[in-house]
Amino acid sequence: MNRVYKTKWSAAHQQYVVTDEHHATKGKAAKSTLAIAVASIMMATGAQAAYMEPGFVAENSTQVTEAQKSFETSEYQKDWGLTAMHASKAYALGFNGKGVTVGVMDSGALLNIHPDLTGDRFSVSSAKGEYGSVGNRYPQAVDKDKGTVGNPFNKGEEFDIDGNWKEGVNDSHGTHVTGTVGGNRDGSEFHGVAWGSNIIVGNTGATDDNNYGPFQDYEYFKAAWGDLAEKIAKANGDRGGVINNSWGTNTRVVDQKDKGHDGYNTGVHLNVNTEAETDYEFMFFAKRYGFDQTAANGIVDDKSFVYAAYEAVKDRNIVQIMTTGNRDMKNPYYRALYPLYNPAAEKHWIAVAGLKQGSKAGSYELVKNFNEAGQGKWWTVAAPGNSIYSSTTDDHGNPGYASWGGTSMAAPHVAGAMGVLMSRYDQMNALQVRDVMFTTANHKNADGTNMEGWTDVDGTVRKDGEVSDRMGWGVPDLDKGMYGPGQFLGKFEYNMAKAGSLDVWSNDISNVALDQRKAEDDAWMKATADGTKLAYGEIITGKDFVVKDGDGEGTESDRTSHIVGDHEKATLLAAYAERAQAIKDKRANDNAGYKGTLVKQGEGTLVMTGNNSYAGTTTVEGGTLLAFAESIGIDNKVTVQNGGKFGVLSSYNDQFTMKGQLVSKEAATGKLKVDIANGGTLVIDAASNVIVDSVTFNGDKKFELSLEGADGSTLAAVFNGEKDAITGSFEAKNNKAEDKLFDNLNAEAKSDFVFFDVAKATGSGNKATVTMTKKDGITVEQFAKTANEQRIASAIAASGSSLTGQILSTKKDQVSLIGDTLATLDDDFYATARNALVVNATAVSRTVMDP
């Protein structure tokens, strides 16, 4: 309880503070639902307060459903993708991307002209420099007979362009994409996913016909992505962020008259259905850009435009979002598949396939004529990408609206989702938030059936937590994503550096995907002899088709310039070697890379209540970790280092993510082992009764008392004399009496709570019992500075609400927050009453507004 209160009134969660940012509706004055909640507490006559504006943030678990509905306006419903991703849950909990900056690289955007892209949330990055090569942005358009030349560029030519839409250079694509990421929530037309985020737009210097085959200039995109990444890093700090890349089209070939694996015409498109075909596209890039397989740092020393994307983010916590492609192919094109050939890039990459609505309400399907996850499944999600309504511009800069489809429309839903999730997890970096999005993704329809397209190409039905070779992780879920990771994808170091901050994870955290990946990695290593040979017969050289690369007049040399050979094969095998080494690294130390591991760092408090089965270790290096017995994974051991604190709870009243009262099912099973280094602390909760296997102190014994397991009604009952005391126990069943585990408990068990004292703290053998009672002479009213604040304090103390629990569990180092909170409630409540937003205004006036 105590930690909820600390964070509720801090910038970490932005609630119960004067700025009250989460309650703002775009274009309207901010209103305080907290003031209304207090009004409800104070109206003993039965009159109820009501928040009349759409879009109010829930203040407790009973309000969440209503709060969700309040955000599901006609504006929200214009983009069905918001419903598919359950975005209203995030909004209802107060998370809309505010405080986070998201990047968009596209064909510019009609900023500060289009009404949904106006305001100081929107800004631009720039690309300035000289082209480093000779090439063509639209090679597929070069046709001597038709007299079309595409969009050529020459080495040494200067470029200087920013993210504003430019007539004659850009099309409407970037304007549509930017609207989906974060278009204004203003009561008209539609709004974007992360409508609270700041958006920085970069410019590809072209239209959506820009070809993302091996044709773009490295120097241009190094400058463009570099400036955008730098601006994101400046805005978000070390947390980094995301850059959405929906732009472009794939490599074309002379029509081969073939079809994709779902039966759609793909004859004019470069095929990427098999390993050999994706490897060919890699080798085609290698030939055109001159990859050097002997470079000291491996093949990533190339100068392709895709490497420029990686180069811009590799030393920052920034993620590049890439579309898989709009063709009926089993795999993504190279841009999205890049980490397959450079494993170091994987943590910086998200690939996006497309989703559409099914025929039945609440059902969804993979768009089968788009590229699927395939070999890139470990970094792929599927997102709404069919008939998406958003902002547009015509050829002359006149704003409008239209519904479009494509993976181009899917990717900005992911960028927006990342913005929302980064506002929820404000102490995680973007790479960690990416993992949260992956591991909480959804593949179920509203009726609980699997979405069409979840089943693998070979018919395997992937179980929950596994990854599909068609949909990847599934669809970003801004409901489940509010409640912590679903899996740890390796070592998860969570640094909660903000003193007094809180996070609560109630999701079950498993090891399922890592188990699946290990099996598949092992199979690949066997098939390729540890990455030393191809997993198939011979490479595709390209001799059986002709790439439309725009190279010239159709001479024999031009028609064969795409053909690869032994040099490119050697480069491919160098990439295989890098992949093999990455797998070997994960196998080291007893397959540590395939075991999800948690390291809690920083001064804040993390509470875990899920039924967790991650396979790795749990370490507390700093701050406090509180958990249910079933929340520590299959290792069943917690290591507490110097400065860290750990405690076990039998219940927890979650008013952070509004889950309400949660109860442990294994509090008495006695399976946890707790190992505490010198300087570490065991937390004993006065409202919990728990049994662990054992506790080992490797130095001085330190104890701290907690009231985290108590709900507001229990604290209020003790505080108001309706109940004598709160009593909890902690037993270590396999410690022996001679261990004298709790011999100094009474000396250590001092209360640093404002409203409660330790009545009794005893240690007998391997069991400790703690009883806490109300501190004599203390009242909530004594922290009030005005008569109005005293009335509010009295109402809070009497109510037994979640707010009561948060205040009554205050510790001494937080005491100033009590007065600040009462003052804030007084100000907000006064303003709310004056604006006639509370039913029974006469009662409100008598209660609060009297001089």
Question: Where in the sequence are the language-model features?
Answer:
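Outer-membrane translocation/initiation segment of Type V secreted surface proteins
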Residues: 6-11, 427, 439-454, 458, ...
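Subtilisin-like serine protease catalytic core
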Residues: 51-67, 78, 88-220, 236-240, ...
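Hydrolase catalytic cores
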Residues: 178-181, 187, 202-208, 385-467
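Extracellular S/T/G-rich loop segment that most often corresponds to the catalytic His/Ser-adjacent loop
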Residues: 106, 126-150, 338-419, 423
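Gram-negative bacterial Sec-dependent N-terminal signal peptides
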Residues: 1-4, 8-50
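Acidic glycine-/aspartate-rich tracts in secreted/extracellular proteins
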Residues: 23, 107-111, 205-207, 248, ...
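Surface-exposed loop/turn positions within long extracellular repeat scaffolds
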Residues: 332-333, 593, 608-696, 711-718
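Substrate-binding/access-modulating region of protease and related hydrolase catalytic domains
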Residues: 97-98, 164, 169-172, 184-187, ...
